Amino acid sequence: TARKVEALIRRMPRGTFEFTDYIEDDVVTDIPIRLKVAMTVGDGHIHLDYTGSDVQVGSALNVPTGGRAHPFMAIALFNYFITKDPGIPLNAGVLRPIRMTLPVGSVVNPQFPAACGVRYATVLRIYDAVLGALARALPAEIPAASAGQGCMVALALPDLEATDDDLWLQRTPPTRGLDNPFARARHALSQIAVTARGFLA
């Protein structure tokens, strides 16, 4: 897998391509959250540098990466690779040629006790930022970043047959949704069991 990804990267133009995107606010304040990425394409590897992204925030929008290369920070690259070569297996090898700089104390590498329960809303905007950098590197293939989806669609339902206070939270992933007539609901939704005491799974 890594060799296939490296071969695709070698076909990309060399250089550093930057893009900055924003989340409108962090819910606690009305100050936008900046997400900045510099994508450097080298010989068979890509470096994503998130230096310049804002410091961790007081709301649950922080993305806990532990400072290591994390799949959440490169989803746009994964989608590009599997679009160019649909035969690439989706495993850890896809991430191996990708290096990352994730500044300590930033929204992309927060420190304890940072809240992070709504991190996927930030991940969606990170996707847009990396897509924007790709658009600058490959304007003939990637026309632009998306219009920006910074929210998750969730539906909470009580379990009427449960004997306790269990609740089912259904989250629609960004790759597929309920508007797809060919997708069955069980594929279109992720189920996460939660209770009033916190997340179970």
For the regions a language model picked out, list residue spans one by one:
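Glycine/proline-enriched, intrinsically flexible loops and inter-domain linkers
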Residues: 1-201
